[in-house]
Swiss-Prot record:
Gene, per the UniProt record: rlmD
Sequence segments annotated as region (Disordered): 1-21
Function of the molecule: Catalyzes the formation of 5-methyl-uridine at position 1939 (m5U1939) in 23S rRNA.
Catalyzed reactions: uridine(1939) in 23S rRNA + S-adenosyl-L-methionine = 5-methyluridine(1939) in 23S rRNA + S-adenosyl-L-homocysteine + H(+)
Organism for this UniProt entry: Pseudomonas syringae pv. tomato (strain ATCC BAA-871 / DC3000)
Keywords: 4Fe-4S, Iron, Iron-sulfur, Metal-binding, Methyltransferase, rRNA processing, S-adenosyl-L-methionine, Transferase
Entry protein name: 23S rRNA (uracil(1939)-C(5))-methyltransferase RlmD
PROSITE patterns: SAM_MT_RNA_M5U, TRAM, TRMA_1, TRMA_2
Any single biological process term in GO: rRNA base methylation
Entry annotation: catalytic residues: C407
CDD domains (UniProt xref): AdoMet_MTases
Amino acid sequence: MAKHERGLRFQPTGGVKSVQIPAGKKQRLSIERLSDDGRGIAFLEGKTWFVAGSLAGEEVEARVLNARGKVVEARTERVFVASDLRRAPACDYFGRCGGCSVQHVPHEEQLALKQRMLAEQLLRVANVVPDEWAAPLSGAELAYRRRARVAVRWDAKAKRLDVGFRAAASQDIVSIEECPVLVQALQPIMSQLPAMLKSFSKPQVLGHVELFSGSSTAVLLRHTAPLAEADLATLQAFCKTHGAQLWLHGEGEPQPASPGDTLGYRLEPWNLQLAWRPGDFIQVNAAVNTAMIEQALHWLAPAADERVMDLFCGLGNFALPLASLAKDVVAVEGVATMVERAAVNAMSNDLHNVRFFQADLSQPLTHADWAAEGFSAVLLDPPRDGAFEVVRQIRKTGAQRLLYVSCNPATLARDTVELVKQGYRLKRAGILDMFPQTAHVEAMALFEVSK
């Protein structure tokens, strides 16, 4: 029997395992195209590289973040040959902070990339092309984000408090003092927040911080133990200087430091005020949110004698504007506390033709009395998992028109397959640029019963 070659291991199946590339290794690569998430794709020695911060046609030096099998994730460290499309990022932390991934791409090209991603998913998964493509719905490139979560961590070994945002593909914190995508009201708070927190006598009890801007500005601090009196006074003075409410989140639910303080946002075209609390979902881009609602109402076009169902209604972001047009709105949400707040929002805005119900929308609708009432139109705004169980039964509602707002083109495409089976046709679709400078795609699609 022949001796084994030194260093060679025989595998039961599949031949010799490929050599894994260590994290931190640098490699020169030729970028061939962009992936669905905006990263450059390169091929080398049988492996596919996904390179953040690169563009098609570029020659770059990339640093490996992690490697698994034949897939390598990396980030651009140096550009040898740049694409004509490349632009200087607006943020000094770009490439280190995990918040924005495509600041090096012109905004018009960002929109085109997102539109292509949506079109490819619909065609590949559902074999569908909409009758009409809508123009991308977009707003300002920067200073759009009205809500942010700031990471805070005490490094006991280094005796250092880190304040900032999570690094790309990591739990590390990138220390940040400015963020150009935050709305203007939050930028001075963000710039002075790290120094204020680092002055605390007991920084080890600090958790994350959340910043909000709406009808009022607010700072929420998560803490794992009671704050020292001096530290609380420092925090209160900081918030007073910036005209912000202070919310504290220790044990139990977050509470305002000043009883009676509330959070909310306005939907000006409909003269609506929506109240919410920390932990509730709201859209972070106020301008695109308003434009999205306007487009949804225009596409769905509910008549004054029609009944509309709003599924995954949240705080009433769509349901309350819909109530100004339709005869009757039935709005359904899975989170009981948000159903309660949505109902309060309807009453406080003097809307009496909208009813709210709590239901598990990951399950079919067949057993709900409100689902059997009959509707002319349905609006869906599900989470990333989509609404597969709902759309399987949607034709039983009698809806002739269905408007689907999606935060995940993959599940929209999957659900489109089922809607086509149910007898609907995709009439119109387009992207919603809710998160400029990122590859995150939101979309709107209008379905109508096939004639």
